[in-house]
UniProtKB/Swiss-Prot annotation:
UniProt cross-references to InterPro entries, sorted A to Z: Herpes_U30, HSV_ITP
Function noted in UniProt: Plays an essential role in cytoplasmic secondary envelopment during viral egress. Interacts with the capsid via the large tegument protein/LTP and participates in its transport to the host trans-Golgi network (TGN) where secondary envelopment occurs. Modulates tegumentation and capsid accumulation at the viral assembly complex.
Organism of this sequence: Saimiriine herpesvirus 2 (strain 11)
Family designation: Belongs to the herpesviridae inner tegument protein family.
Pfam families cross-referenced by the UniProt entry: Herpes_U30
Record GO biological process: virion assembly
Protein name, per record: Inner tegument protein
Superkingdom of source: Viruses
Stretches the record annotates as Interaction with large tegument protein: 463-899
Location in or out of the cell: Virion tegument; Host cytoplasm; Host nucleus; Host Golgi apparatus, Host trans-Golgi network
Assembly description: Interacts (via C-terminus) with the large tegument protein/LTP (via N-terminus).
Chief site of localization: virion
Key words, A-Z: Host cytoplasm, Host Golgi apparatus, Host nucleus, Virion, Virion tegument
One Gene Ontology cellular component annotation held by this UniProt entry: viral tegument
Length: 899
């Protein structure tokens, strides 16, 4: 819906040459917004009312008498911010509009909607919110102004401000170790909590860099630039706090961990350790013993299980108070599961698949599944919380979010989210309830059926409220025509036959007849509507004709009220589809419902009438073809990116497979490698380990790109799932239309094929040798079971003077179980050449930066110059020699050379 200034509405009304065109302007405005800032001008409102006086329809008269209700119902603020200063500005604007309206006189027959009542309600709302600070729950008006767009916007931003409340829960303040202290201090700073009890961030960063050097691993950027971005960012934060100099991210190592950090980590602060989650997700253990990793997994799995149980109990209620919602938010934030943490884990870690079958850590699958479940829940919890308010704005936004959740949990995408939770059900407490009483009262006090139709569409679109038509009283024929003059049917029939489409003048005597409705329906509504629905009329002409059917003799032709109500709804819905690319998902379904109601009313007079569908078919295409095009582009993009990445990754997979099926002979720091048709090649251990890391890293980088593309495809499929749900309802409607163009069923099958291909590719890549190359060559990366120095000490052991502890420490290292090696083959010369490309990097690590420090002191004896002796700054010889110059020509040069 677009925003228009009141001056433009006034200008369009003034330009309209007849009653019908003026009504069109007012009707079209019902589907747009007005800029509320223009209502602060009395002149703008007065000009609008003066032009409105020139029309005499019931519709325009009602607007003139209740102009504040009409204008504020459609008014919106130009910008919306959820800070206290902005909220005060919005209140001031509302107050100014009320002050201006007070100076403009208008008579009204409705106490519920009259201008003074509206002014009183708004003034009362402004007064009640005068002390709003964002700490207490905002006040919500419980009267007609809650249906005004501008008032809903103020209520909504107040709630947005309220949900950004200061954190008040308790967090463990005794960290275990220097690293946890750093993470906790960072967390306190992010939550705007007092962290003065800890050392400054600079002091902590200095301590970590100087005393905990084992935490910083200078891995190559090609290996971990994509697979460990969180560890990189954590290290960057520490280095940034350590120095004020500019830090180059590519030169910063990644933040790692040892057995001590895993043992000391507090489970209640688990999600502060996002870099550990990232490392374990990608199975980087940094040589920490398996039993230590499994203990870490076990204690944090227990913590997450308890957290899940608490959340599930709290979300089991269909409605929660604000304090209960606040408590869930604090529960998540206290363990580090903030909105930003969810985003980091979603985009950097959980986006890629993880293989549970190849991992040997006990409890690993449950551990990762709980992380995924909590992150997904928290992500959508924060999204819902941001939009949560008891307004139609909140209802629309949250319904859209939960539809997305339902699509994610559909059978198609559930393979990636095998959770026991149904998030859409758990988060349903966020959906605000419609203010039914206020909507019904407002609808009842609106007298023009055109405005009733527009209000009904608003209630259905914003609140999904569909009870208005069922509960609204309609005038009966007995009551309406009790005092109508007796006119013969032939006279009414002749009048309708001669009535020209588009005329605005009418015979009151005839249109008040109880026979007029049947004849008007027979001679005008049926043929006009049939021509429109057969798509025989140009679009603008069709809208004009439909509008005329609605407004002709609208003030007196009471017998047409029942059929004009769905005609009005149909008109507004068609306008929305034509002019709004983001029209409601159920727009076509609404059109079918309105046409079905019109058909039933017509069949009362003409039982054989059926609704043509050609025009509806075109509406279906207008509504859904752009979406079909965008979804097709998403598929094409996924296929293109995946094909490119697979093409790039296949050589690595082939090389990794060949490497794992080749025999290696280790001699000191060198490996002999069998080459087909050649003598064995030699490669030093350092070069081989670098090649292994590089091949695995590049494989994972390509896989991360595929996973990112798949994530985008999932997002597109969520949109398709919502469309398919609506189209399913359309296909089952009593007015049957074809839903095969655009063919979303075919599109859905294409998506499913892409998902199937992705799963196949995922299994092939994640279970390939190159993806897990460091695991296959883990012996190279493991520490020696018994170092050479220890062996030498054993050989030269002296019972009296030597300590046996080094030997005992070596024996205490766990022995990893290795599978039997498969039958070995040999590398081809091409394979070995490619291996050498990765084994000999130009720069293995980034060079250390050279830092020079200067002062005003000399590091050599000061130079003393006797300026009385040295009177000149240039050298002057004591006895200048006389220099003789000869002009050299080519002739002289030739003569000299010929001598």
């Amino acid at each position: 819906m677009s925003v228009k200034p009141l001056t433009e509405l006034t200008k369009n009304l003034e330009a309209a040459s007849n009653e019908l065109l003026k009504t069109k302007v007012l009707m079209d405005m019902e589907l747009n917004y007005l800029s509320i800032e223009q209502l602060e001008s009395a002149q703008n409102i007065t000009d609008f009312l003066n032009i409105l006086k020139q029309t005499s329809s019931q519709y325009s008269t009602f607007i003139h008498q209740h102009f504040l209700f009409y204008l504020l119902k459609l008014s919106t603020f130009s910008t919306l911010n959820y800070d206290l200063e902005s909220i005060k500005q919005y209140m001031n604007i509302l107050n100014n509009v009320c002050d201006v309206a007070t100076t403009i006189h208008a008579t009204s027959s409705s106490n519920f909607l009259n201008n003074q009542t509206v002014i009183n309600h708004i003034k009362q709302y402004i007064t009640s919110n005068a002390t709003f600070t964002g700490l207490s729950e905002p006040i919500v008006p419980n009267n007609v102004i809650s249906t005004f767009r501008c008032v809903e916007e103020v209520v909504h931003v107040c709630f947005q401000c309220y949900w950004h409340f200061p954190f008040q829960a308790q967090i463990p303040q005794i960290p275990n170790g220097a690293l946890e202290k750093w993470l906790l201090t960072q967390h306190f700073k992010f939550l705007n909590l007092d962290y003065t009890a800890f050392n400054s961030l600079k002091d902590q960063a200095t301590y970590l860099i100087t005393h905990e050097k084992h935490l910083f691993v200078p891995l190559s950027s090609s290996e971990y630039s994509l697979t460990l971005p969180l560890a990189k960012n954590q290290a960057l934060n520490i280095y940034t706090s350590f120095t004020t100099n500019t830090i180059t991210k590519s030169n910063v190592p990644v933040l790692a961990f040892s057995a001590k950090e895993l043992t000391d980590a507090t489970p209640e602060l688990f999600f502060l350790y996002d870099f550990i989650i990232e490392a374990l997700y990608h199975e980087h253990s940094y040589n920490v013993p398996q039993n230590i990793i499994e203990q870490f997994i076990s204690k944090n799995t227990q913590f997450m299980t308890d957290l899940c149980n608490t959340i599930q109990i709290k979300c089991s209620n269909k409605s929660l108070t604000s304090s209960e919602i606040r408590h869930i938010k604090e529960l998540l934030e206290s363990c580090g599961l903030t909105e930003e943490c969810c985003h980091r884990l979603q985009t950097s870690v959980l986006i890629s698949n993880v293989s549970f079958t190849s991992n040997s850590w006990k409890g690993y699958e449950t551990f990762i599944s709980l992380i995924s479940q909590l992150v997904l829940f928290s992500d959508f919890f924060y999204k819902c919380l941001f939009y949560f308010s008891p307004t139609s704005i909140g209802h629309s936004k949250i319904t859209e979010i939960l539809n997305t959740v339902s699509a994610i949990e559909s059978e198609t995408l559930s393979h990636a989210n095998k959770f026991s939770w149904k998030l859409a059900n758990m988060l349903s407490f966020f959906i605000p309830k419609a203010p039914s009483k206020i909507i019904l009262e407002t609808y009842t006090h609106i007298s023009p059926y055109l405005m009733k139709s527009a209000f009904s569409i608003w209630a259905k679109k914003t609140w999904n409220y569909t009870w208005l038509d069922a509960t609204s009283p309609h005038p009966t024929q007995t009551h309406t025509f009790k005092h109508a003059p007796v006119i013969s049917q032939s006279e009414v029939q002749k009048y309708c036959e001669n009535l020209q489409l588009g005329t605005t003048e009418y015979d009151s005597r005839i249109v008040n007849s109880h026979l007029f409705a049947e004849e008007f329906i027979t001679h005008h509504i049926i043929p006009t509507l049939t021509a429109i629905l057969q798509n025989k009329v140009q679009k603008n002409r069709a809208l004009f004709q439909l509008r005329w059917l609605i407004v002709f003799a609208s003030d007196e032709a009471k017998g047409l009220y029942r059929i004009r109500r769905p005609l009005g709804l149909l008109y507004f819905q068609i306008i929305e589809i034509f002019h709004d690319s983001n029209a409601a998902a159920a727009a076509i379904l609404n059109v079918l419902d309105y046409l079905n109601e019109i058909q039933q009313l017509i069949q009362y007079y003409v039982p054989t009438y059926t609704t043509p569908i050609k025009f509806i078919q075109e509406l279906f295409s207008i509504k859904y073809k752009p979406q079909s095009t965008e979804l097709s582009k998403s598929i094409q993009k996924f296929i293109a990116e995946t094909e490119t990445c697979v093409k790039d990754i296949l050589p690595f997979i082939q090389l990794g497979t060949n490497m794992c099926n080749t025999t290696y002979y280790h001699i000191e720091n060198t490996y002999n490698i069998n080459i087909q048709g050649q003598s064995p090649a030699r490669l030093d251990t350092k070069a081989l380990t670098h090649a292994i890391k590089a091949i695995q890293g590049l494989t994972k980088e390509s896989w991360t790109t595929i996973s990112q593309s798949y994530k985008e495809l999932q997002t597109a499929y969520i949109q398709l799932a919502t469309i398919l749900e609506t189209i399913e309802k359309i296909s089952q409607h009593s007015i049957a239309i074809k839903v095969s163009n655009p063919n979303f069923i075919k599109l859905n099958n294409t998506f499913l094929q892409c998902f199937k291909k992705y799963n196949t590719i995922a299994n092939l890549i994640t279970n390939s040798h190159s993806f897990n190359l460091t695991r296959y060559f883990r012996q190279i990366f493991e520490p020696e079971l018994i170092p050479i120095t220890t062996v030498q000490k054993i050989l030269n052991f002296n019972d009296e003077t030597d300590d046996p502890q080094p030997f005992l420490d070596s024996l205490s290292q766990p022995l990893y179980s290795h599978t039997n090696a498969p039958k070995k083959s040999e590398l081809t010369s091409e394979d070995f050449n490619r291996l050498l490309e990765f084994a000999n990097p130009v720069f293995e690590t980034a060079p250390s930066s050279i830092k020079l420090h200067y002062s005003d002191t000399f590091n050599t004896p000061q130079v003393n110059i006797n300026w009385k002796t040295y009177e000149h700054t240039t050298y002057i010889a004591d006895s200048p020699a006389e220099l003789q110059f000869t002009h050299l020509t080519s002739a002289i040069l030739d003569a000299e050379l010929s001598k």
